[in-house]
């Protein structure tokens, strides 16, 4: 049973001559890691903003647990490419910030924040200042903060796009570990083809002008990693390479058609 449903979603910004998204149908179910991939102009970020409730669709319906999505809510945790952390607070206060806004008592929210920091392998970082952290560590704090409120689904907006290649791979692997441990459904958007193929249980390819779904792939590479297989072995698997090259060809063809 799907937790999150998008039915015939369209989006058009005021003054624009064409919609940014048209007739999008998606569902996100338990233990699913749904990845949306597409070239510039395919509406990836707009799609995530609609699900997060930051903007309303022009048409169609978005529901979570059967209830319409109407504005932001704590049941949808969001991790941004820009870590959006509070530089004047320490790591613990940043992770506990949403719980503080919700009125959770200090001892309870700090205990939850420490639990989430341990989950993302930052157990010894609670008293660190944000400026003392690397880019990857900041993203771990952002992930811990999103999870602290125990959301029904986790939304990730190109979360590793600003990281170097080595740190990006580390964060991909950490995300799969967290996904396995928490069983949280994840919706992630990315422009990185290998990342999309490695992480997704379902990969949705978007075409631009207007953004629309052109292909869906059911994949198991991330599940294999979560089950204990090494990332190197998975990424050297001929089936992984074949899938990556197929997706690359589709993305390039969409870019050429929209040029």
From Swiss-Prot:
Q: Where does ATP bind?
A: 38-45
GO annotation, cellular component aspect: plasma membrane
What's the short name of a Pfam family annotated to this entry? ABC_tran
**EC number(s) reported in the record:** 7.6.2.7
PANTHER family xref list: TAURINE IMPORT ATP-BINDING PROTEIN TAUB, TAURINE IMPORT ATP-BINDING PROTEIN-RELATED
Query: Which NCBIfam families does the UniProt record give?
Result: PRK11248.1 (NF008421)
Protein name, as recorded: Taurine import ATP-binding protein TauB
Gene name of the encoded protein: tauB
